[in-house]
Amino acid sequence: MPELPEVETTRRGIAPHLEGQRVSRVVVRDRRLRWPIPEDLDVRLSGQRIVSVERRAKYLLINAEVGTLISHLGMSGNLRLVELGLPAAKHEHVDIELESGLMLRYTDPRRFGAMLWSLDPLNHELLLRLGPEPLTDLFDGERLFQLSRGRSMAVKPFIMDNAVVVGVGNIYATEALFAAGIDPRREAGGISRARYLKLAIEIKRVLAAAIEQGGTTLRDFIGGDGQPGYFQQELFVYGRGGQPCKVCGTALREVKLGQRASVYCPRCQR
């Protein structure tokens, strides 16, 4: 599933080609995504100029002069720029044609993504209750410490809760916990303030590094420019269960936490 760095990579790839451009037509070949694409999307968006492309959590917000297209890539979706008129292949559900001669094409083999229209996106039900962005000053270790008090759940699903902080998905939660030396199974409410301060720093560092590397290519992800991400080469623990730790050589262990695989080093993480 594309996580925050992959979505931010997509935003950075498509924004320069969309902002300031006028939409000439929207072609929807299949409306059956996680939620049906609005039947009047072509009418609402065609003829409008795109003002900006923003990201909130893992949602892309394509802001037009009036209204916003809210897009989510789901489990296997991607948005990329192609030449106008390029024939569509299987699973290529939507084309947003631009007067510049390019079009933004949405591909989603599993159809778990979304394309919705809103006149007030930040108050849309999908975005209204989201926590702070992890790379802003609104997120820090003190927030983690305060929100964790009295919580008996494991620390990994705690930091993956979008009400706590957005965009810390499975890959980056796994890597940040390793970097902070925290066992992902530890009870969230039992971790000290000092360790949460360290964890918040590592969450920011890991996410920033992943964005600079263009995200992590695992199975389906490609960026808005059609290029893969390279952060997979930097992974210390994610997807490496049973292999030796790159720091101490101890065999990494894999457990299930919140229905997700979690890999950790029993020596480096306490």
UniProtKB/Swiss-Prot annotation:
Keywords: DNA damage, DNA repair, DNA-binding, Glycosidase, Hydrolase, Lyase, Metal-binding, Multifunctional enzyme, Zinc, Zinc-finger
Binding-site positions, DNA: H91, R110, R151
Gene3D superfamilies listed in its UniProt record: 1.10.8.50, MutM-like, N-terminal
Record's protein name: Formamidopyrimidine-DNA glycosylase
Active site: P2, E3, K58, R260
SUBUNIT field: Monomer.
Cofactor note (record): Binds 1 zinc ion per subunit.
Catalysed reaction, written as an equation: Hydrolysis of DNA containing ring-opened 7-methylguanine residues, releasing 2,6-diamino-4-hydroxy-5-(N-methyl)formamidopyrimidine; 2'-deoxyribonucleotide-(2'-deoxyribose 5'-phosphate)-2'-deoxyribonucleotide-DNA = a 3'-end 2'-deoxyribonucleotide-(2,3-dehydro-2,3-deoxyribose 5'-phosphate)-DNA + a 5'-end 5'-phospho-2'-deoxyribonucleoside-DNA + H(+)
Origin species: Pseudomonas putida (strain GB-1)
Lineage: Bacteria, Pseudomonadati, Pseudomonadota, Gammaproteobacteria, Pseudomonadales
Zinc-finger keyword on record: yes
Function statement: Involved in base excision repair of DNA damaged by oxidation or by mutagenic agents. Acts as a DNA glycosylase that recognizes and removes damaged bases. Has a preference for oxidized purines, such as 7,8-dihydro-8-oxoguanine (8-oxoG). Has AP (apurinic/apyrimidinic) lyase activity and introduces nicks in the DNA strand. Cleaves the DNA backbone by beta-delta elimination to generate a single-strand break at the site of the removed base with both 3'- and 5'-phosphates.
UniProt entry tagged with the keyword ATP-binding: no
Pfam families: Fapy_DNA_glyco, H2TH, zf-FPG_IleRS
Zinc finger (FPG-type): 236-270
Family as reported in the entry's similarity comment: Belongs to the FPG family.
EC numbers: 3.2.2.23, 4.2.99.18
GO BP terms, alphabetized: base-excision repair
Cofactor(s) essential for the protein: Zn(2+)
One MF annotation (Gene Ontology) recorded for this entry: 8-oxo-7,8-dihydroguanine DNA N-glycosylase activity
